[in-house]
Amino acid sequence: MDGGGSSSWTHVSKNLIERRAVKGCLLPTPSDVMDAAVMALKDVTENIVGQQLFSVDRTNALSVIHTNEVPESIIATAIARDTSRDYLREYEGAAKCNLAATDLSHDEMWEVVIKRYWRYLRESSGAEVVDRGAVGQATQSVLSVLLLQSTFGKKRLSKNPFKHKGPNVGYKSNLEDLRSAFTKIEKYMYYMRPNDPMTKSEDTELRLHELLAYVTTCYRWLLWFMDLTDAKVLRNIDKGPVITHGPRESRPPDELVRRHLKSGPAISAGTGVALTLSTATADALIVLLRMSVSWTSHSWKSNTHGVTGAIVAAVELVTLIHHHLQYIINTVFAGYVCWLDGGVENSYLNSALRSQGRFDHFVGKLVPIMATLSWANMEKGTVMWFKYALAKSIVCHGSPTQHYLTVLESIASKRTGACPPQGSTFGRNPSGFPGQFCCPPQGPLPAPPNSKTRGTFRRCRPGSLRSSRQLPTSPPSNIVSPRTNPAIEGSTAAKNVQGAETIQVRSSGEFNDCIWYINGAYPHQRSDSSSSDNSTCSSTETQYITLPSTPSPTGDVVYTNPLLGPDEEVDASPQPVDPMSDYSAPKNPDYMRPRSTLVEEVWQLRDSDYTPYMRPSRAGRSRVRVEDQTLEPSSPAGCNPPANSPENDSDDAAVDSPPISPEVVYGTFRPRAKCVYDQYGLTALAALSASRAKARRTRPGPTQPDVCRERDEESAEPRHDGFIRRTMSTTGPPRKHPDQTERVSSL
């Protein structure tokens, strides 16, 4: 028995220590900690992000793709299944909580908007506008109304900005189409993210380029729209500007839209990986183009309430578009910047940020900009998802990749204002990323082997650790550092008793906590006519114009040279753009390719006497052009004008119609691109372009009756030095009125 027991114990005790040490010791390893951290982040993230990001179908579809790309079919499926705006659940809840905390009625919100606009108009134009009381400080309620009301409010503040019922109904329809397009673009951006933020994704980069180019175009449209609105307001209240600048945006909307539709990043790439996105951005831009026609041609009510109603509706439209564009830029800063080549130094991102900074410089007194940190406090899901994705990627790769380190170094270089020193760049060791848990050693460091020097340790003085954490070199994990002294730097961060999220904004003239990503600080006054990237204090002289004591008969605003910066002469030149010029995009051969010039575009077939926006044609007359000493309206084949357009009338009706009063001048206005009233897709635009080019090449000559009729008209209508006089009625003698004479330039 003893021998058997001894033999049994010998066999059992052979690996007893090893087995107990392996199976019984629960000391966590670094891999255990990382796995637990990743799982904890995943549990938290799943509760606050859209469910489609963690759906089984998406996970299975991406598991068979061995690259860091997301096909458009997966994105389109997620967009179609998200019918309840699940992607915006957390952000929308925080926004509505902010609006509820304002405790303002409908009339009080109206007063907030109209007072802010009068103050902005007085400071931007110099007109003597008397409002009913000062606006006061930018409180939390005012900021919530100006930033969130137009997007998340229960109803619109101003429902009828125009004089007649028809334009108001059309404007409501356009507004609904615009909201739908914005939602589709935001959903696309939300669900297009790959799984690995530390690996380059070419398809995602191209989609980000398309979104950022779209942001640039929309901000330029907003500046044009504010020029139009301010001019019409001053004309309606019989005020003239004292300090006049050039137009803040010199290109009309149709050129801005054509430029993006023709040669945007997604179209120029020709790969088809962003076809759904390019269609969505094109739909939004075409709706903006239709709104340009509405606000240019339709009149307002002449009474005081009519003017203020139009102002409130215009501000609502501007804040709606501005909030949508801010969502795109803040989402890029929340994590999507890791897929941009060069990080924050990407040229498309810089162009979008410069457009936003220019908008803030001129319109910031009216519409503030939300700080990225405030946006992240409301949209917690995106920030949390990137933390989870980065932790999972570090576990898979073992260390940060070189691509991710390059993005971090681009952010660090913007913080310090220059490239980091040679020895301060981030390495692959996780200890090279300082955080809130980093601290100096609490004891002497051991001396290296075979070293004659002893390990020395000098304990830091009290408070030195805290001071070391307040150095300007902030951790690379924070995209934007919070302000340290809100009272001095002018930040607004108010807290309410209901626990709503606060909003931090930066007014235009104050110090910018995100100055590292805007190429122009714009610290000078708004009356300056240019900005410089090299000097934050240099500015050109304000141009003054002495206006007569009585307002001009036309009531138009007199502009001087365009208000541009020294580096914007090519991008925002007032000269007409070359029809075959390319999109002003970064020189990237991977995404830009030469385009064929064999097919003429729709916009190249303009009449020779077209006029830009805010300059309508003569009352009751269609634009004409001279061809072989004849006078005939231009009506291109394949494009039917609108129902209220003068081109719908026959030739006899155009001659026999009675004269129209000048009050309906804007009713006969039509845009330079005559086929933008319907929602044309990219395919329809290409087909329309080809058909018009073919019709122009095969245009038949005039028939014999037409020639006889033209000769009779030539003999009956005398010419005087390039002017052509046209009779509006055949029942009486020609009227000697200067408004019935128009200048027609020969082709």
UniProtKB/Swiss-Prot annotation:
Residues 707-724, 736-747 have a biased composition (Basic and acidic residues). Keywords: Activator, Host cell membrane, Host membrane, Membrane, Phosphoprotein, Transcription, Transcription regulation, Virion, Virion tegument. Its main location: virion. Disulfide bonds: none annotated. It comes from the Viruses. Residues 528-540 have a biased composition (Low complexity). It is found in: Virion tegument; Host cell membrane. GO terms for biological process: regulation of DNA-templated transcription. The keyword Hydrolase does not apply. Pfam families: Herpes_UL46. Residues 465-484, 541-553 have a biased composition (Polar residues). This is Tegument protein UL46 homolog. It comes from Equine herpesvirus 1 (strain Ab4p).
